[in-house]
Design a protein with these regions (language model features):
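Glycine/proline-enriched, intrinsically flexible loops and inter-domain linkers
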Residues: 1-477
Length: 477
C-alpha cells in the first residue's frame, strides 16, 4: 500500500489529521487505478454519453438503452486481466460474475455474454495454451451454470501477450423500463449486504489489478461460485418486483470500501456501517480485511426499514444470506465502526473522488521506426501465402471455443456464434444485434485510426444482420 506524493498532499490538505489504518486501506483501494480511473478519467470524459435512446440515471454501472415498447437493454464490458494471467479459470470466471452483477444492479435480467480474449502464441508456448484453455473453461463454466448464453466473442494470439492474458467480458441485460432501479435513499434507510460471505479472497485485488504483474499473487484472485450468483439474480429480481430496493450496487473492486463510498457520493448521503454485522466466511478477519475483501457474489442494497422482513423472506426462500450492516445518514460521511469503536470517518466524496493524474505523454519511438510503405514483394507463392493465412490460429475456426458455451440456453439466440454478429430475440417482438470487436495491432501502429477501425468494424458487423447501431460500450486498455 503506497500513495503518490500528490495524493499525500491531497490527504493532508483535506483531512488535516493522521489517518487510521482502516482509512488508509480504504483510500488505497478506492484510489487505485483499477477503481478510480485516475489516469484515464479525463480522457474517457471525451466520449459521447448521451443520445436519443440513452437513459442516464445516478449510480448505474452499466449503459441503459431504450428499445421501445416500455423495455430497456443494459450493456457493460470490463476486463479481468491480472487475475486471469495468474489463475485463468477463476480469474475469467469471476470476470463473468462481476459484469453480470453490474447488469443486475440496474434492475435488469442478464440475458447474454460476450468475450474478447488475447493470449500468447499457442503454437509454441505451452503456458499460453494453458492460459487459453483454462480461461475459456472458466467463462464457459460460470455462464453455463447461470443459464446465460455466451453468444459471441473473439480470440487472438500474439507473442506480445507472452505470460499474460487479456480477458474482456461483456454482458447484456433486458427488462422493463418501469422496473429500473431509480437509485435514491432516505435518512434512516437500511444498508444491506446480500449474497456470498466475506472471506480473504481478493483482499488487495484492486491494487493488484493496478500494478505491473510481477508474481503470482493467487490470494488476490477471487473465488467464483456461480450457483450463489444464480440465486442472487433470482432473489434480487424478486425484491425488485416487490418494490423493496431503493438503491443497489455490486461489490466488485475494492469491496465494501468502494461500494459504500461510491453509493454515498452518487446519492449525496452519508452511510454508517458496522463491520461486525458483515456475514463472514472466516471468523478471524480483521476490520481492514472486511472492508477491502473482494469476495464475489455480493450485492449492496439500500431499502426502507419497512421492507426488511420481505427482503429477508425472499433471501431465505433462495437460501442466501442477508445482513443489515448499516444505515443512511444525512451528513454525507462514510462512517465505519467496529462495534462501538469508530475506525474510519471520512467525507464520502473525498473517498470516491480521488485526485486525478495528468501523466506525461509522448509519441512512442517505435512509431518512427515503422516502414512508410509495405515491404518488398514476398518470395512466397500465392498458394503458400493462402495456406499460411488459413493455418494461423487467428484465422482458423474458433469452433473449439464457442462449442464449450451453451449459446442456446434461454431460447433467445437467433443468430449464433461464428457469424458477423449475434442476434437475440427480445420480449417486445424486436431483435437485438450485438458484436464485440478489437484490433490491437492496428491500434499499436496508429492508435486513433485503430480505434476508429474497431468501432467501424463493429458497426458493419451489426449492419450485416439488418440492424441499426444505437449504442456502444468500450474498454480501452
Amino acid at each position: 500500500m503506497s500513495f503518490q506524493e500528490h495524493e499525500k498532499q491531497h490527504i493532508e490538505k483535506n483531512v488535516k489529521r493522521k489517518l487510521t489504518d482502516t482509512e488508509l486501506q480504504i483510500l488505497a483501494a478506492e484510489w487505485s487505478e483499477h477503481c478510480s480511473y485516475k489516469s484515464s478519467k479525463k480522457h474517457l470524459r471525451m466520449l459521447p454519453t448521451t443520445g436519443p435512446n440513452v437513459i442516464v440515471e445516478k449510480g448505474y454501472d452499466s449503459g441503459v438503452l431504450d428499445v421501445g415498447d416500455g423495455f430497456v437493454v443494459t450493456v457493460h464490458i470490463e476486463s479481468h486481466n491480472h487475475p486471469s494471467a495468474v489463475e485463468p479459470f477463476g480469474g475469467a470466471a469471476t470476470g463473468v460474475g462481476g459484469v453480470i452483477r453490474d447488469i443486475l444492479s440496474a434492475g435488469t435480467r442478464p440475458i447474454a455474454l460476450f468475450d474478447g480474449l488475447r493470449f500468447g502464441n499457442i503454437e509454441n508456448d505451452a503456458h499460453a495454451r494453458w492460459l487459453f484453455k483454462n480461461a475459456v473453461s472458466g467463462i464457459a463454466d460460470y455462464g453455463n451454470c447461470l443459464g446465460i448464453p455466451t453468444i459471441g466473442g473473439e480470440v487472438e494470439f500474439d507473442d506480445c501477450y507472452k505470460n499474460y492474458a487479456l480477458v474482456d467480458v461483456a454482458a447484456v441485460g433486458f427488462g422493463k423500463k418501469s422496473k429500473l432501479i431509480k437509485n435514491h435513499a432516505n435518512v434512516d434507510d437500511l444498508v444491506l449486504l446480500i449474497g456470498g460471505s466475506t472471506g480473504r479472497d481478493g483482499v488487495g485485488g484492486s491494487q493488484f489489478a493496478s500494478d505491473a504483474l510481477e508474481g503470482e499473487d493467487r490470494s488476490a484472485v477471487q473465488i467464483p461460485d456461480p450457483f450463489i450468483e444464480k440465486l442472487i439474480i433470482e432473489a434480487i429480481l424478486e425484491c425488485r418486483d416487490a418494490n423493496c430496493i431503493n438503491a443497489m450496487k455490486d461489490l466488485g473492486g475494492g469491496g465494501l470500501s468502494c461500494a459504500i463510498s461510491e453509493t454515498a457520493e452518487s446519492l449525496g448521503i452519508g452511510i454508517e456501517l458496522d463491520v461486525k454485522n458483515v456475514h463472514l466466511r472466516e471468523s478471524d478477519l480483521s476490520p481492514d480485511e472486511i472492508m477491502i475483501s473482494e469476495s464475489q457474489e455480493r450485492m449492496l442494497i439500500i431499502s426502507d426499514p419497512n421492507n426488511l422482513s420481505k427482503i429477508k423472506e425472499i433471501c431465505n426462500k433462495f437460501r442466501i444470506q442477508c445482513s443489515v450492516i448499516g444505515t443512511v445518514k444525512e451528513d454525507k460521511m462514510m462512517h465505519v465502526k467496529n462495534g462501538d469503536e469508530t475506525i474510519a470517518l471520512l467525507p464520502a466524496d473525498f473517498v470516491a473522488r480521488g485526485p486525478l493524474v495528468d501523466r506525461e505523454k509522448s509519441k512512442p519511438e517505435y512509431l518512427s521506426k515503422l516502414p512508410s510503405s509495405p515491404s518488398s514483394k514476398s518470395e512466397m507463392s500465392f498458394s503458400d501465402i493462402l495456406l499460411k493465412l488459413l493455418s494461423s490460429p487467428n484465422i482458423a475456426s474458433k469452433h473449439w471455443v464457442f462449442r464449450q458455451y451453451d449459446h442456446e440456453v434461454g431460447i433467445r439466440t437467433v443468430i449464433k456464434p461464428g457469424f458477423d454478429s449475434s442476434v437475440l430475440r427480445l420480449d417486445n417482438g424486436k431483435s437485438l444485434s450485438v458484436k464485440i470487436d478489437g484490433n490491437p495491432k492496428h491500434c499499436y501502429i496508429d492508435p486513433r485510426q485503430g480505434a476508429i477501425g474497431c468501432f467501424e468494424e463493429a458497426c458493419r458487423n451489426v449492419v450485416c444482420t439488418g440492424a441499426t447501431p444505437m449504442g456502444m460500450v468500450a474498454h480501452p486498455q
